[in-house]
């Protein structure tokens, strides 16, 4: 387990900024809590308290499976891909949000896109192709995706047109359990 390089840090924060904007600073500077850090272990970026990172330094690399919250994976090309396990933090700090009606929740949780008929609410001034957090109408985070249309376009579009492209959802915990660890 090692700290992220400058290039890895830049890629991670660029990717996170697409979802949570300037709120990325809140991940490291949490008020009333201890300092948190990002660490790389086996091409996975983990988010944890600094105290936990220091304790993990005593464990050998082969014996350590994971520690903290899995935030992202680094692909073979060096790109960073945000994982659904980071949903709690993305949902908390997200600038743009979409709420899905109960009749479309199941479809989204099985990896489908959301049409206009399933759109409950959308944050004002959401631009087209903006990364968004997806919630149920009861404010339960379901996943994240990309807004297929802006807020104004959503109000004027046909009922069967796509308004949200699926990226990740909490159903992945069950579908891809082996890949998550």
Residues covered by each model-derived region:
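Accessory RNA 3′-end/elbow-binding domains used by RNA modification enzymes
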Residues: 1-181
């Amino acid at each position: 387990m090692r700290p992220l390089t400058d290039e890895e840090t830049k890629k991670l924060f660029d990717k996170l900024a697409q979802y949570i904007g300037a709120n990325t600073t809140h991940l490291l500077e949490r008020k009333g809590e201890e300092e948190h850090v990002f660490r790389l272990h086996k091409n996975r970026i983990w988010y944890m308290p600094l105290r936990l990172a220091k304790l993990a330094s005593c464990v050998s690399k082969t014996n350590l499976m994971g520690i903290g919250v899995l935030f992202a994976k680094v692909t073979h090309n060096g790109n960073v891909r945000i994982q659904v396990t980071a949903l709690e933090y993305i949902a908390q700090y997200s600038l743009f949000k979409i709420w899905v009606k109960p009749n479309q929740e199941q479809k989204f949780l099985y990896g489908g896109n959301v049409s206009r008929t399933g759109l409950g609410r959308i944050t004002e001034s959401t631009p087209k192709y903006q990364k968004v957090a997806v919630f149920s109408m009861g404010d339960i985070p379901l996943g994240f995706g990309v807004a297929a249309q802006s807020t104004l376009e959503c109000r004027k579009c046909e009922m069967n047109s796509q308004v949200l492209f699926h990226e990740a959802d909490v159903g992945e915990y069950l579908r891809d359990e082996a890949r998550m660890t």
